[in-house]
Amino acid sequence: PPKPKTPKKKEPKVEAKVPDAAKDSLKTKSVKPPEKKKEQEINPAIKALAKVIFSLKNVSFNWNETNGLLLPGFNRQSEWLGQNWDGSSAPGFAFTFGSQNQDIRERAAKNGWLTTDSTFNSQFTSTYTQNITGRATLEPFTGFNIDVNFNRNYSLSTTENYRAFNSPRANGRYYETLARVETGNFSISNLMWGTSFTKDRKDYSSTIFERFAENRRILSERLGNENPNSSGVGIDGYRDGYSGTSQEVVILSFLSAYSKKSASRMSLDLFPSIPLPNWTVRYDGLTKIAFVKNLFQSVNLNHGYRSTYNVNSFTTDVSYVPGGNARDINMDFIPKRQIGQVSLSEQFSPLIGIDITWKNRNNKSSGSKSATERGGRSSGGNFTTRFEYKRDRNISLTLAGIQVTEVKGREFTFGAGYRIPNFKFPFGLFKSVNSRRSNDLNTTLDFSVRKNTTILRKLVEGTNQPTAGLTIISIKLASDYTVSERLNLRFFFEKTINTPVVSTSYPNANTAVGITIRFTLSQ
């Protein structure tokens, strides 16, 4: 039989009481973890630079140069590879393969490759063009795009009559230049933002033009310091050789005033080397805001800026002497290049522009069907609106008489468009032509008001006179409809009202109404 289980005896519990003082001594002290070293703060300038670098989406840069030489009077026969193989090796492989070394003139004359006819009058010509363009696209945050661009264009054409000789002249040369002339033009992207919103006074006088006149003394002083041939200050307060009507003084003062550059620190080069940036800005992220998203399908904000400095043409002054010591009748130093006119242009295109595509609000009732359910196609936003405000300036400085012509323009444009999807003409019109499909009818309406003003400012006389100007009101209405793949209809109405600013002109209005039918014979 199984043995009965004996119950286990309970062991007595022993409790040891610890005095309170001992408890305090037994408490473990909490050890704080070592503090982390604070991260070294990054310089804000470095942060900003890094942000710009990482926002770059696309960068392009182009530097193009074109050179050319034309040397008439060559009296050898060119054969294969462009050489003359009678022992002279004229004109040489370097020339035929594109060398632009102008020493070819002396070498050709010395080797007897050029005609020595005294009646020969064709000109040696060399050409040079340089085009520099750059472009970068940045996206600092989603939906915000900035296109930055710059450019610099320079062209130079050199022509000279010459004589070639069979024996060296007194200077040991076989080639003699008779008349050398350089002509060219120049343009570079610029910034005029600092004076864009400066208003004229009621009498058409301008603080910018006054600054232009004042800056002449500062720049005359700087130019005089650069030229060791200039000595002292004249009774008119200008440096010797650089009066208030000197070409260099006037052009540099013009640039400093209208581009708002410091006359004390700006470059003295009439042909700057570094182009300044222009830009275009677009933002389409407003629809991320809830109440905007409920109303509009898309909202685009636009802004564009462009400015250019132009030297329309320049030519060599035949009276110029290297070293800058030759003077004209006004006792000013004669510059190497004679410039007739320079200009500054600026366009805000637009200063601000808004393009909106509205959401359709039709068929909200529960019982109505959408266009897609009715067998049509989803049309998206049918109604579009846009607003643009543009500003532009074209300021030209004519050195003859030293006068500035300012042409300013401002334009407001309001536009609207509406698209009727699946439009069908009444009375079954075009039904046989377009029986298989229905197209959209697109209608646009543009209303614009533009004001142009031309002001002539004369530096010596100190006058400011409006010479031309118009207020132009324009209304344009147009509807387009594609009847078929080959037939397109367009109705248009245009009204333009011109109101002159000066009393010597008369107001006029023009109206144009019509229908355009375009039929494509081949698809």
Language model segments and positions:
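Exposed, low-structure sequence patches enriched in small/polar residues
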Residues: P1-Q523
